Structures are given as structure tokens and as C-alpha cells.
Design a protein with these regions (language model features):
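Acidic, metal-coordinating catalytic segment for phosphate/diphosphate chemistry
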Residues: 1-24
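A generic fold-level signal
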Residues: 2, 20, 28, 43, ...
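Conserved beta-strand and immediately adjacent loop positions that scaffold enzyme active sites
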Residues: 24, 32, 110
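Conserved Nudix-box catalytic region and its N-terminal flanking loop in Nudix hydrolases
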Residues: 28-67, 71
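Active-site-adjacent beta-strand/loop module that shapes the phosphate/pyrophosphate-binding cleft
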Residues: 29, 76-77, 83-118, 127-130, ...
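Surface loops and adjacent helix of pleckstrin homology
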Residues: 38, 107, 124
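Short histidine/acidic/glycine/proline-rich micro-motifs that form metal-
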Residues: 55-56, 118-120
């Protein structure tokens, strides 16, 4: 995000305690499928997204990631979280799908469970890179 932009769904860009660090997570089922969320933003309409988001200043990556996933999916991550890699201000992690039902927030309109060979076309290449490192 550019310095002048504001997130429509949180206080990012309006609240000085928010950072520009973003964490995303590849959450996989025992069957090898992963969760993708359909974004509901003007900037990325109908794009598929990995769960995650902005990490607040003073918040650990893991705590921020757990908070973002709970906000976006209603899932409480109880399994260990492993770092895949970081590039620029974005970090990618992975974990196993916890028990529970997915409940979407206002940030997303839909979700799918998809295998690597069934990836949709409208997903960022950087997300696909992270997914390929896990699956």
C-alpha cells in the first residue's frame, strides 16, 4: 500500500500504530487443499486472497496472523505456524486447518478449498509462489 492509501476495512492508514508489514498464511487441510478467500475491495475485486493482513506495531507476526485469520475466517489457529519466507514487507507462513466452521468477515465474499492443480486464474502470482512452496 502506498503511504497515502487507507484500508477500507481496518484502521490501516488512519491509525498511526498500524505498520506496513503484511503476513499471509497458507492453511492446508489433511487432504492437501488450502483456503482461498475472495476479496471484496475496489482495488482487487473478485481476486482470490490468502488469509492474513497488516501486523500492528508491537504485535508479533504470529499474534497478528492469528488475529487476522480469526477476523477474516472465524477460525482460531491452534496448530503450529511455520514461516515459509519473506520478501520486502510481506511474510508468508503455513499451518494446518483447525477444526471449526469458516465464517467470513466483511472483507471477503466467498471462500474455496482448492488443491494446487485447481488454482483459480485470478490470484496473485506472489500467493501462488507461496502455495507452491507448501503443496
Amino acid at each position: 500500500m502506498l503511504d497515502s492509501e487507507e484500508c477500507q476495512h481496518c484502521d490501516y492508514g488512519r491509525d498511526p500504530v498500524d505498520s506496513k508489514v503484511v503476513c499471509k498464511i497458507v492453511i492446508t487441510s489433511d487432504e492437501g487443499a488450502l483456503i482461498l478467500l475472495r476479496a471484496d475491495t475496489e482495488k482487487f475485486p473478485n481476486r482470490w486472497d490468502l488469509p492474513g493482513g497488516h501486523i500492528h506495531i508491537g504485535e508479533s507476526m504470529e499474534k497478528g496472523l492469528r488475529r487476522e485469520v480469526l477476523e477474516e475466517t472465524g477460525l482460531e489457529l491452534t496448530n503450529p505456524i511455520f514461516k515459509i519466507y519473506s520478501i520486502d514487507r510481506e511474510s508468508y507462513y503455513t499451518t494446518k486447518l483447525p477444526d471449526g466452521e469458516i465464517t467470513l468477515s466483511h472483507e471477503h465474499t466467498d471462500f474455496i478449498m482448492v488443491r494446487r492443480d485447481g488454482m483459480p486464474d485470478n490470484i496473485s502470482k506472489k500467493f501462488v509462489r507461496a502455495i507452491k512452496k507448501v503443496l
